[in-house]
Structures are given as C-alpha cells and as structure tokens.
Amino acid sequence: MRSKFKDEHPFEKRKAEAERIRQKYSDRIPVICEKVEKSDIATIDKKKYLVPADLTVGQFVYVIRKRIKLSPEKAIFIFVDEVLPPTAALMSSIYEEHKDEDGFLYITYSGENTFGGFETA
C-alpha cells in the first residue's frame, strides 16, 4: 500500500527525521499511522506518533480508536506490512521486525480486515 506520508516527504528528509527522533528519544518509536485508502472508517487527524517502546499493539490500537473517536461496537484493524500484528506484541519488537529503511514504522488501519493475514507470535 502506498503511503501518503512517503509521497509527501522525500526519503532523505524522512530518514534524517527518524534518526533525530531516535537519538533524542531512544525509548520511543517513530510511527506513521494512515488509513487504508478505500476504508469507510474515519480519517485520523495526526499521522506521526512517538510511541513508548513498551506499549503493546493493543494499547496503540486504543490510542488510535480514541483519536478517530471510534465507538466501542465498531471494529478497527491495524496492519504492519499488510499483516495483523499480535495484540500482545510490544511496539518495540514490531518496530525491529518491520521498520522501514527510512527508520519509521508504517502502520495502516481499516474498519475491515482488508488483507486477511494474521501474524503468529
């Protein structure tokens, strides 16, 4: 899936920003969170997040739900490299496995399970 953030910011600029963030906040992970293009779920107001390394995927999903004001009965799915990461996984381990060459972790979210795959821990 194409990232609007990648389209809007050149690679060198993204890489420099991620490196600066990692140096300044070594216990945090630079995350770009974007909606899957054709999803009918609300669009998030902020794409860039500085996430504590010890946050779980489930806790991050909670943050996203709050930001898009998603009601409890509505589903949300987040994807890393088009795969659903385990809810209990730490963001730091997801980052180490899936970070982009620019240093950011790219996460997409949708109101439906658009890709269908699950990652097993």
From Swiss-Prot:
Name the SUPFAM superfamilies on file: Ubiquitin-like
Post-translationally, this protein is described as follows, namely: The C-terminal 5 residues of ATG8 are removed by ATG4 to expose Gly-116 at the C-terminus. This Gly-116 forms then a thioester bond with ATG7 (E1-like activating enzyme) before being transferred to ATG3 (the specific E2 conjugating enzyme), in order to be finally amidated with phosphatidylethanolamine. This lipid modification anchors ATG8 to membranes and can be reversed by ATG4, releasing soluble ATG8.
Membrane topology value: Lipid-anchor
Its signal peptide is none
User: Where are lipid groups covalently attached, annotated Phosphatidylethanolamine amidated glycine?
Assistant: G116
Print the keywords alphabetically: Autophagy, Cytoplasmic vesicle, Lipoprotein, Membrane, Protein transport, Transport, Vacuole
* Pfam families xrefs: ATG8
Its family?
Belongs to the ATG8 family.
- Could you tell me what this protein is called? Autophagy-related protein 8
Source organism (scientific name): Glomerella lagenarium
